[in-house]
Amino acid sequence: MYDQVPYRDTDEATPQIKNDASDSNRSSIDTTSTTSLILERLHREDPDDSPGEYESSGPSQRGKPDEDDDLEIGRAARLKPMERKVRRAMYLLAFLMIGGWFLALAVYVSREHFGTPDTAHDPSATATRKAGKKITLNQVMRGAWRSKTHGIQWINGPHGDQDGLLLTQNSFGDGNFLEVQDVKNDSNTIVLIKDGALQGSGQPVSAIKGWPSSDLKKVLVASDHEKRWRHSYNARYWIYDVEKATTEPLVPSEPEARLSLATWSPKGDAIAFVKDNNVFIRQLGLDLTSEYYSVTQVTKDGGPDLFYGIPDWVYEEEVFSGNSALWWSQDGEFLAFLRTNETEVPEYPIQYFVSRPSGNNPPNGLENYPELEFIKYPKAGAPNPVVHLRFYDLKKKEDFAVTVENDFPDDDRLITEVVWSDGKYLLVRETNRESDVLRMVLIDVSARSGKVVREVDISAIDGGWFEVSKNTRYIPADPASGRPYEGYIDTVIHEGYDHLGYFTPLDNKDPILLTKGQWEVVDAPSAVDLKNGIVYFVATEKSPIERHVYSVKLDGSNFRPVTSTSEDGRYDVSFSKLSGYALLTYEGPGIPWQKVVGTPSGDQSFVKDIEKNQGLATLAAKHELPTFHYSTVNIDGFDLHVVERRPPHFNKKRKYPVLFQVYGGPGSQQVSKSFSIDFQAYIAAGLEYIVVTVDGRGTGFIGRKARVAVRGNLGYWEAHDQIETAKIWGKKGYVDKKRIAIWGWSYGGFMTLKTLEQDAGRTFSYGMAVAPVTDWRFYDSIYTERYMHTPQHNQEGYRNATISDTQALSKSVRFLLMHGVADDNVHMQNSLALLDKLDLASVENYDVHVFPDSDHSIYFHNANRMVYDRLEQWLIRAFNGEFLKLDGLKPIREISEPLRKRNRELV
């Protein structure tokens, strides 16, 4: 139905090894191939009769007589004799070629090191020419190919007027534990904590993390970290006095207390913390008779079902991507915090068969039973946690709520962002449960009132949704600089693309448009220079698969690139507090690097190298790396980006197997011009398979029209785009269209199964799905309903998105399913439900591997290495045709007896 698809292949290549003008140092692969051709000519009747690697696995693949593949007879018994002189000449030539091959091999082996190119990485080359070491899976798994990056935390000086200060934390034995560096002058370094091995309350304290107060006189220190969920943890907290070099517990009355969160006030005179799901505040420097009374308990009814100041599981995973749900006002006089009531949220049991994450010993007689952890997990359509915003007035010592006019009902409200102004106002971003109606709420904490100042129904505009955003930037009033009113910068939709809008005053619903065009801003804005009225941001203006830094004035004028767009590049950036400096991270396509640079807001001539990744460059120079070829495919009018990873010494005359790697989640992106030697690169370079990734409809940065097309019917268009792209690749002369596979993890696992189901064996022969969603009714409500609505509003869509067509799955040659038993994100229930469907339908063309006590990342007890070992070995078996032999298996006796009978007849 979809065989004829328009295709635009720019064949833009980004290889990992520089081209060499000479072929004299090529791998012995080419010579071996030449020798094999000569020997094959001596014993071949028809050049086209020799089967390829895949076809040789069985006579049914070619329709030839059974004798063609008989291991004891072979075709040689029926070949015609050659003329004697010709045969002698051919043998002589063959022996000369073999001798030359052995001589070349001896020279190659005797060399002290592998041939290397002139540079480690040349994005302009199109093929690997020189020989080098092979990439190994061990290298990839231990992180040898990961670039080094340094996360810099920019901070203000003690008085807030010093720019270019950064906070650096080092590992034990690697310099000062915590220090403040001046990027302009290394001699101005301020050592906050010299050694992370501290003493507190007469006991040793091993610091794992430190946060200085704004005046740099004290440091909040965490120790004894215990992981909770993906982003959260419990720890013991301490206050370190920099001048006195003393350490005291944050909670004086409970030095052993484990807290879920602790954070400084902006002025450094108080710390808010969460213990047992309640909010507390410790005020410092008070003239009190007892340190104990400096701690105020703000809330008192927190417990297993009621959270204050920290998110529950679903808000941590899908909204805040962190462990904090409290926000200090900029003057430190108010504290806003989230109240989360999950009383009505159903529980899901997580089973641990090997370990006991709770740390508790089981009761006598129950040692052999698994440990159960019950998590409040709202699945699609189930009751959500009910959230409210509450406030604490530190001067009046009052805890209060604010009534918002025209607010969402409790069961239809998501609070996704809170931003304080300079004064007593704050902005609250809310959406309805299905994330397609946005309301920006302005709250006056002095008047204790709130109102909706902006409402957008995106479902009426393009049928799409709002993603969770945490990049709203408050802009204070400054009449002298042309800003008479307060305002904020937010992402807005303009002509089908995400852009920046400046809303001023705070209650204005019509923005000043700062950017526009058929491209999108990314997590913007990155910084705002208030003194000069400059907004900095990252965007895709040059290409959806690149990232460059740009700037624009607050009035929308003077749009310009900050990084050079004359060359391909993917950049990330973080700015100093006054925007005069930036940590610029170049992620590829060449060897990544990091520099601190001066910005247009400061001294643009300033450059300081932070990381050159010289070790990675040396490693790349010694290895044969795949080449990366970027192109687009046009499917149903959408230009979709593709990256093809080709093996070193790619030969277009060969027939290569192809592996498609997929994620495909809404708003995601896999195809990008970044340096990445990962599992996919290993498959291409180490196993010499082609690996293709295509970002289909639903993915990000190609406009909302392509993105929102998947709403309400996840999997259909995404799988369609994978299949159509695979058909295009199957027509390429260097691709073996009978050996095409697909694999993915999480949403990519769902995409793998959905693609196999929709394709029904016509294009993809194999698939490997790790931790897949198989029924969206099993996944969490906030994520799922954003893209699918609720099951109550979209029953047919949920049925269509479920992996349920077992007969279609049975038409692929074989697929692999893997899952962590203790997955708290994509529950094992997904894979078990699919296995039950396969059992009922008597479908058996699959393999399964489960990992006890592993969560969604699958790490417990060497599990992560096992995942990739299994993927590699299973893929080799698939492309070697081994799974084709599993169909119609017979006992060895039934096979060997006809062979013996036939051999007797030939004697």
Curated annotation (Swiss-Prot):
Residues 22-36 have a biased composition (Low complexity). Residues 1-88 are cytoplasmic. It is found in: Vacuole membrane. It holds the Pfam family DPPIV_N. It is an enzyme of class 3 (hydrolase). One of its GO terms (biological process) is proteolysis. Its EC number is 3.4.14.5. Residues 110-907 are vacuolar. The chain crosses the membrane at residues 89-109. It is a single-pass type II membrane protein. GO terms for cellular component: fungal-type vacuole membrane; plasma membrane. Glycans are attached at N185, N341, N800. Residues 1-11 have a biased composition (Basic and acidic residues). InterPro entries: AB_hydrolase_fold, Peptidase_S9_cat, Peptidase_S9B_N, Serine_Prot_S9B/DPPIV. Residues 1-71 are annotated as: Disordered. SUPFAM superfamilies: alpha/beta-Hydrolases, DPP6 N-terminal domain-like. The keyword Protease applies. The active site is at S746, D823, H856. Keywords: Aminopeptidase, Glycoprotein, Hydrolase, Membrane, Protease, Serine protease, Signal-anchor, Transmembrane, Transmembrane helix, Vacuole. Type IV dipeptidyl-peptidase which removes N-terminal dipeptides sequentially from polypeptides having unsubstituted N-termini provided that the penultimate residue is proline. Belongs to the peptidase S9B family. This is Probable dipeptidyl-aminopeptidase B.
